[in-house]
Design a protein with these regions (language model features):
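Detector for C-terminal structural segments
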Residues: 26, 172, 214, 218, ...
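N-terminal lobe/hinge region of extracytoplasmic solute-binding protein
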Residues: 38-89, 201-204
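A structural "hinge/loop" feature
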Residues: 41-57, 81, 108, 130, ...
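Gly/Pro-rich hinge or "lid" segments in bacterial periplasmic/extracellular proteins
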Residues: 71-72, 149-156, 160-161, 167-233, ...
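Aromatic- and charge-enriched surface segment that lines or borders ligand/interaction sites
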Residues: 83-131, 164, 252, 302
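Ligand-site clamp/hinge motif
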Residues: 196-199, 225-272, 399
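Structural transition elements
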Residues: 208, 297, 303, 327-363, ...
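A bilobed periplasmic-binding-protein/Venus flytrap-type ligand-binding module shared by bacterial periplasmic
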Residues: 222-226, 286-311, 507
Length: 540
């Protein structure tokens, strides 16, 4: 990430056009073929402005494109729908030059008007996008966020193939934001025709188009013959079957009936799979920029009291929790995961101390504890982890009833101001949208992200830290990189002083695929948030 920041800052200084980086195709890749992927839950939405979980992230990526992209399987930025861009000397104005001949899957040509519409839409509070806060550096964002404007002042259409975006401050993460799903381009007429159901009737410029969605059964993607990246994708068809228990999906993979169990390897079967050389050869693993955590809703007493939140942090036996998932994770006491710029290996956080936790509860006025609810995603191992958390809380007098729900229901409850007192994030644990510490603050801990539909499930707001985050991200020069990371380490330490979360563990990513599939391992465990890059895998 430091190399990316340095190269971006150099571009800002020189104001040179940046051309697309080459991707070397796999020489063994073949065109054609169909695959089947399974999931336990149906997908909540395929609207890029709304979808924000590990399940729909890679699916949305295959249906839509943004101005920027990543070289497949890497953290290296490359232009997407913009074939090049220029940056002003002050680093605040980006001029994107769009590719000619790009079409939406409804047949219409994409233009700069679509870029303007898409960015206006994602930042409009009526859309309730959980990613709206990512665009806070664009001029006019605050007016959009408060409802006093209906379009972003800083986004201008220059001509049909040129769009100019002006920022209100230099932003070291801006090009990465332009590669996020939230920045993907959508056609106005399709959104208006479908209304709130656009996520069920997606129209984009991506490598695939959706041809069927039978709720509770399957979603079908077919190759977009007009895709602007010639020769891609390799697959003709992907069928996503839903309602599949992970253990059953693994059995079907072993029988050759499916190609990818989307929910990964069931923890109860992990030792068995890894102990069988034939099955272990099909496993792809990668350290993930991910943190699993418990949120405490500061809008819901008694979690408005710091001593209560500190007590909960001290009550959780994280070593025991990691054993539930066969040691595929390491306990943590901080927000940022190892490997993320700004991670502080010396920061330990709250130690496991049930006696100290009980003393803090008594100090807060709850010597006998209290009753609350803990929400959890209902697929294994999350209910078992939640039970372990429940037991730890009971030891200090907190009686937490478990609310085991479908993923979409947990996400909905978390986004409401006073619905979910506590949430175990497992299955929805925060994984990096891009490799920068700001991504572990803006969308999940900033004041803006605590609004309706957001992912700040603690509804935590520290305006001083919001200001510090903006100041850190204004450091765009190469010589400021170390200072910027130091600033972010300090911000995260102050977050933990407020204790809105219990960071529990950092988990490695494990997935499997059938032996008939090809493609580099990095495509099945993509390092930039997309679990699987469907655009580049293939049938042998």
């Amino acid at each position: 990430m430091q190399k990316l920041l340095a190269s971006t800052a150099l571009v800002l200084a020189l104001s040179l056009p940046v051309m697309a980086q080459d991707y070397t195709p796999d020489p063994a890749a073949k065109q054609g073929g169909e695959i089947t992927v399974t999931y336990h839950d149906d997908v909540a939405t395929l609207d890029p402005a709304i979808g924000y979980d590990w399940q729909n992230w890679s699916m949305i990526k295959s249906l839509f494109d943004g101005l920027m992209d990543y070289v497949p399987g890497t953290t290296t930025l490359r232009p997407g729908l913009a074939e090049s861009y220029d940056v002003s000397k002050d680093g605040k104005t980006f001029t994107f030059h769009l590719r000619k001949g790009v079409k939406f899957t409804n047949g219409r040509a994409m233009t700069a008007d679509d870029v303007k519409y898409s960015l206006d839409r994602v930042t409009n509070p009526k859309t309730q996008s959980p990613g709206a806060g990512f665009f806070g550096s664009i001029k006019g964002y605050e007016a959009m966020a408060t409802g006093s404007a209906t379009n972003l002042e800083g986004v201008k259409v220059v001509d049909p193939l040129t769009v100019e975006i002006t920022l209100n401050r230099p932003d070291a993460t801006f090009l990465q934001v332009m590669a996020l799903n939230f920045s993907y381009i959508v056609p106005k007429e399709a959104v208006e025709a479908s209304g709130a159901d656009f996520g069920k009737h997606p129209v984009g410029t991506g490598a695939f188009k959706m041809t069927d969605w039978t709720l509770g059964q399957q979603i079908v993607f077919e190759r977009n013959a007009d895709y602007w990246r010639k020769g891609e994708p390799y697959l003709d068809k992907i069928t996503f079957q839903v309602g599949q228990e992970p253990v059953v999906a693994l059995l079907r993979l072993q029988k050759g009936e499916i190609d990818i169990p989307g929910d990964g390897i069931p923890p109860a079967k992990f030792t068995e799979v890894m102990g069988d050389p034939a099955q272990a050869a099909l496993v792809v693993s990668q350290a993930s920029l991910q943190t699993g955590y418990i949120t405490m809703n500061l809008n819901m007493p008694p979690f408005d009291k710091l001593e209560v939140r500190e007590a909960v942090n001290m009550a959780i036996n994280k070593e025991r929790v990691t054993q539930i998932i066969n040691g595929r994770a390491k306990p943590t006491g901080q927000v940022l995961p190892p490997g993320m710029p700004g991670y502080d290996p010396a920061f330990k956080g709250f130690a496991y101390d049930p006696d100290g936790a009980r003393a803090l509860l008594a100090k807060a006025g709850f010597p006998d504890g209290f009753e609350t609810q803990l929400f959890v995603y209902n697929t294994d191992p999350n209910p078992r982890i939640a039970q372990a958390i429940q037991q730890d809380l009971a030891k200090i007098g907190i009686k937490a009833s478990l609310q085991s729900l479908a993923q979409a229901n947990v996400i909905q409850a978390g986004g409401e101001p006073a619905s979910a007192a506590m949430i175990w994030s497992g299955g929805m644990a925060w994984a990096a949208d891009f490799p920068d510490p700001s991504d572990f603050f803006g969308p999940i801990l900033s004041c803006q992200s605590g609004g309706p539909g957001g992912w700040n499930w603690a509804h935590y707001c520290n305006k001083d830290l919001d200001a510090a985050a903006q100041a850190a991200d204004a450091m765009t020069a190469p010589e400021q990189t170390a200072d910027r990371m130091k600033a972010w380490s300090g911000i995260m330490a102050k977050v933990m002083a407020d204790a809105p979360w219990v960071p529990v563990f950092n988990e490695s990513r494990y997935t499997m695929h059938s032996p008939r599939l090809g493609g580099a391992n990095e495509l099945y465990a993509d390092p930039v948030a997309t679990p699987i890059n469907f655009d580049y895998i293939y049938v042998k």
